[in-house]
UniProtKB/Swiss-Prot annotation:
Keywords: Isopeptide bond, Nucleotide-binding, Phosphoprotein, Ubl conjugation, Ubl conjugation pathway. CDD domains: Ubl_SAMP2_like. It comes from Pyrococcus furiosus (strain ATCC 43587 / DSM 3638 / JCM 8422 / Vc1). This is Small archaeal modifier protein 2. The C-terminal glycine is likely acyl-adenylated (-COAMP) by UbaA, and also probably thiocarboxylated (-COSH) to function in sulfur transfer. Functions as a protein modifier covalently attached to lysine residues of substrate proteins, as well as a sulfur carrier in tRNA thiolation. The protein modification process is termed sampylation and involves the formation of an isopeptide bond between the SAMP2 C-terminal glycine carboxylate and the epsilon-amino group of lysine residues on target proteins. Is able to form polymeric chains with itself likely at Lys-55, similar to ubiquitin and other ubiquitin-like proteins. May serve as a proteolytic signal in the cell to target proteins for degradation by proteasomes. GO terms for molecular function: nucleotide binding. There is a cross-link at K55 (Glycyl lysine isopeptide (Lys-Gly) (interchain with G-Cter in SAMP2)).
Amino acid sequence: MKMIKVKVIGRNIEKEIEWREGMKVRDILRAVGFNTESAIAKVNGKVVLEDDEVKDGDFVEVIPVVSGG
């Protein structure tokens, strides 16, 4: 089984998600309860866009966005 490791920064969430062909960053965000407006992602240490594809074995860090006034 091919997997992607995911860690949500600032929360105690670390999990592995099964990788699928054509999987994108937005799919990973949704899998851990975020959308593209509520978090940004780094793949293997680089900030990425929601439409970027992820590969088997990638390490994804999800960084929740804090906003307000």
